[in-house]
């Protein structure tokens, strides 16, 4: 079995660690003895639905469906944290914001933009806190330049209160940390540079704008709430209070690649679980883990812990679509799509590096998009 540990640091050094590749002998599945529950958001027939999956120690099964979570298109804008997730979507020119708290198993759904025509808006990015939803959008104004706005909408279902902050540049991404909102913007008319607008949520005032240069493409937060600005070849870590910056540069061919992931999970130790594009692998979208403290990436190629028969026939894996970590059992959960079907997938559970043992698999009538561990 062969795996790779890619180390990137400010000195641009890197190293590789490998072990033997899996043979075509069937991999033994190891059963767990600790009960775990997972909430899995899946795509099926262009809609999202959610199920509760239970692991009893003897088997892993779908226990029930979340009846309160439905009618959400699969192409909705998604924003997730460790504990909750929200979706923004527009249907028949009506906008909605649906939020799910995995810790309390509660769902809220609120209408948005009832004062505007949703079909005339281009919503670019969304985020949320425990109290508010944040929606960055642009709209055309007759005879004027485009208007760029962030709307702050209460998640209280009994009130429709909101406020708006006008931006002078196009919003690209948005993220909340503490009592501040961070908006990645692009000056598309003059410099093509990216900027970070810092908004005080107590006053809805932009208190600072940072010049990020070119190719600042995405925002994340780490386990301590610091803001991660992701570039193709590096990332910048920003303290949300002091706005102090730290720079991390990757060596050649050691880029983690989390800038393109559709799903991710940050654990308590500061490791980012994501899926990475590997064009030369048997499955090109694969699980990976980036350790911010060690500045290293472990890439999980399917052919290194599954046999060819398991990969192509038994599990029939086309690509990684979701990822999570079960800290009770020390398992990596890999959601995947099956070959030949748009609406069939499953979840593999494996032990992380250096063991790489297959625990079990669950086939699903849908393609996992996000997994929460209870």
Q: What are these language model-derived features?
A:
Residues 164-249:
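Solenoidal tandem-repeat scaffolds enriched in leucines and small polar residues
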Residues 25-29, 70-84, 116-130, 164-178, ...:
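Repeated scaffold domains used in trafficking and secretory/extracellular systems
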Residues 31-45, 80-92, 131-142, 179-188, ...:
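Short beta-strand elements that form the blades of beta-propeller/WD-repeat-like
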């Amino acid at each position: 079995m062969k795996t790779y540990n890619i180390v990137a640091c400010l000195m641009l050094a890197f190293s590789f660690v490998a072990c033997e590749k899996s043979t075509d002998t069937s991999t033994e599945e190891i059963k767990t003895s600790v009960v775990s529950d997972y909430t899995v958001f899946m795509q099926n027939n262009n809609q999202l639905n959610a199920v509760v999956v239970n692991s009893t120690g003897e088997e892993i099964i779908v226990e029930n469906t979340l009846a309160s979570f439905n009618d959400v298109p699969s192409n909705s804008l998604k924003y997730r944290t460790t504990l909750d997730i929200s979706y923004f979507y527009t249907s028949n020119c009506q906008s909605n914001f649906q939020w799910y708290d995995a810790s309390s198993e509660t769902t809220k759904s609120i209408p948005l933009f009832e004062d505007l025509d949703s079909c005339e808006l281009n919503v670019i990015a969304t985020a949320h806190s425990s109290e508010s939803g944040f929606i960055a959008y642009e709209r055309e104004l007759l005879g004027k330049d485009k208007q760029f706005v962030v709307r702050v909408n209460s998640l209280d279902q009994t009130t429709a209160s909101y406020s708006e902050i006008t931006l002078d540049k196009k919003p690209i991404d948005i993220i909340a940390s503490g009592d501040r909102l961070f908006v990645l913007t692009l000056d598309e008319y003059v410099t093509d540079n990216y900027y970070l607008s810092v908004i005080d949520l107590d006053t809805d005032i932009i208190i600072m704008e940072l010049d990020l240069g070119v190719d600042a493409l995405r925002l994340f937060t780490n386990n301590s709430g610091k803001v991660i600005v992701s570039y193709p070849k590096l990332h910048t870590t920003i303290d949300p209070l002091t706005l102090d910056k730290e720079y991390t540069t990757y060596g050649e061919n050691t880029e983690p690649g989390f800038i393109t992931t559709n799903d991710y999970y940050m654990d308590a130790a500061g490791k980012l679980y994501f899926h990475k594009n590997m064009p030369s692998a048997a499955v090109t979208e694969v699980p990976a883990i980036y350790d911010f403290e060690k500045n290293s990436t472990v890439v999980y190629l399917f052919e290194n812990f599954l046999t060819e028969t398991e990969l192509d026939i038994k599990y029939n894996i086309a690509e990684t679509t979701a990822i999570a970590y079960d800290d009770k059992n020390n398992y990596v959960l890999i959601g995947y799509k099956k070959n030949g079907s748009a609406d069939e997938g499953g979840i593999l559970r494996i032990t992380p590096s250096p063991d790489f043992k297959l625990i079990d698999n669950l086939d699903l009538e849908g393609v996992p998009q996000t997994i929460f561990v209870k």
